[in-house]
């Protein structure tokens, strides 16, 4: 990959991270259950991506059974990831949800060698542990059994499913268009979550519906498609460590839009995460094409 292509991929990836960082704000902005928010975003993401693929005259389904099964599995993982992510935000706080989610660079460093012909280098382990340290500083004191503890467990499980979904998509689906890959994952998640309509009323007020449409189309369909496109061109561990900037983006957005002022923990942890991301960015740009 040329230096120009690397720069373009890096900028696309960072823009996707900035948009995805805004997802957590909807946990506070939308007055609906975690299940309904997740179901709504998958429905509107699926519709948006379907219309985009039809407009571009692109296929919406894969032609091989293996690819469709991989897409089904990735969609299930994506649904679980989104549910546990928003559950973490409700049980603990949006900050804790974002920060525990970003233990996934550490998880990715150890998962990737299992499925790809690569071994983690000492630098990979160092950067992953640096991210973990930054996240650890950001999380306040734990007390097992309370909502904070349950929120952190939910966030960690969200991190695992997110990391494994990326691995499945990278290994089995990276030769397909990112919009098609994201459409099938969103559709699978929407079908899986459809039963929520039986016990949770569908929102009828314009505010909730409008925010769900915005979350599903722009902050999910567009943002995650751009993320998938960039991720397919990067090593998983590189994507994981570079994406560790997302907690910093989320904290800044919450500060600007919701008035949540970061404390000293957020500042110190954010600096460590930024440092790890900067080192990985420099290393990525120096790699031989």
Name each model-derived stretch:
Residues 9, 32-80, 105-111, 161-165, ...:
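Transmembrane alpha-helices of multi-pass small-molecule transport proteins
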Residues 36, 43-44, 86-119, 158, ...:
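Specific alpha-helical transmembrane segments that line the substrate/conduction pathway
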Residues 97-103, 169-189, 220-256:
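Helix-helix packing/entry segments at the starts of transmembrane helices
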Residues 6-9, 31-39, 62-68, 140-161, ...:
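Juxtamembrane helix-entry segments on the extracytoplasmic side of multipass membrane proteins
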Residues 1-40, 47, 73-76, 84, ...:
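Glycine-/small-residue-enriched transmembrane alpha-helix faces in small-molecule transporters
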Residues 30, 37, 41, 88, ...:
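Hydrophobic/aromatic residues within transmembrane alpha-helices
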Residues 49, 53, 72, 78, ...:
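Hydrophobic transmembrane alpha-helices of multi-pass small-molecule transport proteins
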Residues 50, 56-95, 101, 137, ...:
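Specific transmembrane alpha-helical segments of multi-pass solute transporters/efflux pumps
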């Amino acid at each position: 990959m040329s230096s120009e292509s690397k720069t373009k991929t890096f900028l696309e990836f960072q823009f996707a991270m900035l948009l995805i960082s805004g997802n957590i704000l909807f946990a506070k902005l939308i007055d609906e259950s975690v299940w309904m928010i997740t179901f709504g975003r998958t429905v509107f993401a699926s519709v948006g991506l379907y219309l985009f693929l039809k407009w571009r005259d692109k296929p919406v389904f894969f032609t091989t059974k293996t690819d469709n099964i991989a897409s089904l599995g990735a969609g299930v993982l994506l649904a679980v990831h989104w549910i546990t992510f928003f559950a973490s935000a409700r049980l603990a706080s949006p900050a804790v949800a974002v920060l525990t989610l970003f233990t996934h660079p550490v998880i990715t460093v150890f998962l990737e060698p299992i499925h790809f012909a690569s071994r983690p280098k000492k630098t990979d382990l160092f950067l992953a542990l640096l991210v973990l340290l930054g996240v650890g500083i950001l999380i306040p004191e734990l007390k097992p059994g309370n909502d904070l503890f349950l929120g952190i467990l939910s966030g960690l499980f969200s991190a695992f499913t997110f990391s494994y979904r990326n691995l499945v998509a990278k290994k089995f689906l990276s030769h397909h268009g990112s919009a098609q890959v994201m459409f099938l994952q969103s559709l699978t998640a929407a079908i899986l979550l459809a039963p929520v309509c039986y016990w949770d009323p569908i929102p009828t007020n314009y505010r909730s519906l409008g925010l769900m449409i915005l979350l599903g189309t722009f902050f999910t369909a567009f943002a995650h498609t751009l993320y998938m496109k960039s991720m397919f061109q990067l090593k998983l561990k590189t994507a994981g460590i570079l994406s560790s900037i997302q907690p910093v983006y989320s904290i800044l957005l919450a500060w600007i839009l919701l008035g949540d002022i970061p404390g000293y923990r957020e500042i110190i942890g954010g600096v460590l995460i930024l440092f790890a991301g900067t080192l990985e960015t420099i290393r990525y740009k120096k790699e031989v094409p």
